[in-house]
């Protein structure tokens, strides 16, 4: 099945910068996240599609490949990990190497030149809003290929050594003639390594590395948000025959909070207040991530009014600036009234009628006057 355009998936233009891409990604990731759509296979596929698009378009190198070659330029780079939520990285040549390898009889038309660097891995870490705002250290378990400590990555059994390949004489490549062309390809005898292991290591079976789930401690800085990525250098898969290891990229996903909604460095919440507090004003308690604080409500406050509490938001992980907490007032209508309470409200409402209506209820009176004028105009 053909893939959708990554820019279309996120709903951004091809000229979108990283900030715009991140802003588009967050609501989509929250909408289709498996935790919110348990058992919904369609939403899970959508989440994977959105996540893949974000990872490609926020990686400068991968985005350049995608812009030039489309999906063919990045599909191989994202594949090869095969460890649950992980994906391995690969050199750009690998995206097309198999095509030429099939034609000329080898894995890559140009042949492999020495041991390959280990693949990069990806891990998605879920955080609560509190953990993201304050920072946290967490242990994660990562399935990976690790360096064999028994043979020290050589692949040879203790007491033996790898022998120079008699076919390519250690070059890792052989020259093959295809009609008029002489083509370099990976040596089929040693698979491009230049060495032959006759007595392989019992632990890694001659590979120099083996599969293991390793435990890592990851320090998450304060202020991270959904879409942020943390690179752990050298914590990816071990390289072949002592080549450098790849990197591990920890992708942050912040779970929804029951009270607060985050937008950049600002936090938003709704605060219910009684209609008497709204009319007369006073102090109310509002929640913050540091505990409850007092908020002064001005008299005659209308529902929907926003109060700003400076410095009660999130400290930026990049600039160090602290955002604000925006409290939206929602006036609560009293319920389950007694007869005496209903009578008091009727008396109060009557006191607002007549000539006093415009003074005490300017918005509603203005609205109904506007409605009356509208219908009067229709009947003329």
Swiss-Prot record:
SMART domains: DnaJ
The protein, known as: Chaperone protein DnaJ
Keyword Disulfide bond among record annotations: no
Chief location of this protein within or outside the cell: cytoplasm
Cross-referenced HAMAP family: DnaJ
Residues holding Zn(2+) 1: 148, 151, 201, 204
Subunit structure: Homodimer.
Cofactor note: Binds 2 Zn(2+) ions per monomer.
Zinc finger feature spans (CR-type): 135-213
Binding site for Zn(2+) 2: 165, 168, 187, 190
Any one GO MF annotation of this record: unfolded protein binding
Compartments (UniProt record): Cytoplasm
One CC-aspect GO term: cytoplasm
CXXCXGXG motif repeat spans: 148-155, 165-172, 187-194, 201-208
Keyword set, alphabetical order: Chaperone, Cytoplasm, DNA replication, Metal-binding, Repeat, Stress response, Zinc, Zinc-finger
């Amino acid at each position: 099945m053909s893939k959708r355009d990554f820019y279309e998936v996120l709903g951004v233009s091809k000229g979108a910068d990283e900030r715009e891409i991140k802003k588009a990604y967050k609501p989509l990731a929250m909408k289709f996240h498996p935790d919110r759509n348990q058992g919904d296979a369609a939403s899970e596929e959508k989440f994977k599609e959105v996540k893949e698009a974000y990872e490609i378009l926020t990686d400068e190198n991968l985005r350049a490949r995608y812009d030039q070659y489309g999906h063919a330029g990045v599909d191989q780079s994202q594949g090869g990990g095969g460890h649950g939520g992980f994906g391995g990285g690969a050199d750009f040549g690998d995206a097309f190497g198999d095509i030429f390898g099939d034609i000329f009889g080898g894995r890559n038309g140009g042949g492999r030149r020495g041991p390959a660097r280990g693949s990069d891995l990806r891990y998605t870490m879920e955080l609560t809003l509190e953990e993201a705002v304050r920072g946290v250290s967490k242990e994660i378990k990562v399935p990976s290929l690790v360096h064999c400590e028994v043979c020290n990555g050589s692949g040879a059994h203790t007491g033996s050594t790898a022998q120079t390949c008699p076919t390519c004489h250690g070059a890792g490549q052989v020259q093959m003639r295809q009609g008029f062309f002489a083509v370099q390809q990976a040596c089929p005898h040693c698979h491009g390594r230049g060495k032959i292991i006759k007595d392989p290591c019992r632990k890694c079976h001659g590979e120099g590395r083996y599969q293991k789930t390793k435990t890592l401690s990851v320090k998450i800085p304060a202020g991270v948000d959904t879409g942020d990525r943390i690179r752990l250098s050298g914590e990816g898969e071990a390289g072949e025959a002592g080549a450098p290891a790849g990197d591990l990229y920890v992708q942050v996903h912040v779970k929804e909070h029951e009270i607060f909604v985050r937008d950049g460095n600002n936090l938003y919440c709704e605060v219910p207040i009684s209609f008497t507090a709204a009319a007369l004003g006073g102090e109310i308690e509002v929640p913050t991530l540091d505990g409850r604080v007092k908020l002064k409500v001005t008299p005659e406050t209308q529902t929907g009014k926003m109060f700003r509490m400076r410095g009660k938001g999130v400290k930026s992980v990049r600039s160090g600036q602290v955002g604000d907490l925006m409290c939206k007032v929602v006036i609560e209508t009293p319920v389950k009234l007694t007869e005496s309470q209903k009578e008091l409200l009727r008396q109060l409402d009557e006191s607002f009628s007549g000539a006093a209506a415009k003074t005490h209820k300017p918005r509603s009176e203005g609205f109904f006057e506007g409605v009356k004028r509208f219908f009067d105009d229709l009947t003329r």
